[in-house]
Amino acid sequence: MDMYGPEPLGYLIPTAEGRLMVIETVRDRRPPQNDVDNAVLFMSMLAYSGRCRVLDDNRFVTDVDVAWHPAWMNTEQTRAFEIDDDLLSVSTVGMVHPNFPGRTGQAVVRWRRTSE
């Protein structure tokens, strides 16, 4: 399943202080007209931040202290990563996404370095 479409928008921002911030959305989000639209917007995004530590086997762990979904608050989110030039590939390690309770899955997200 392509949760956020073929060309999602987003940023993964590591800071010098050891914090990681991630936001990812569907590209064609529209302003909501009603409560149903608001719910669709919530389901079409992901955002979290926390202290991050890199492990020695190409994995990192984020201790989440703020998130778009309360289920991720105060959790550890572990990701595998691979760097190839300006491309960072990040994959989940078998997780349950809060928008899909009871279903375990894996995601791979590719981030390209920007000059901004």
Labelled PLM ranges:
Residues M1-A47, V54-E116:
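Lipid interaction determinants
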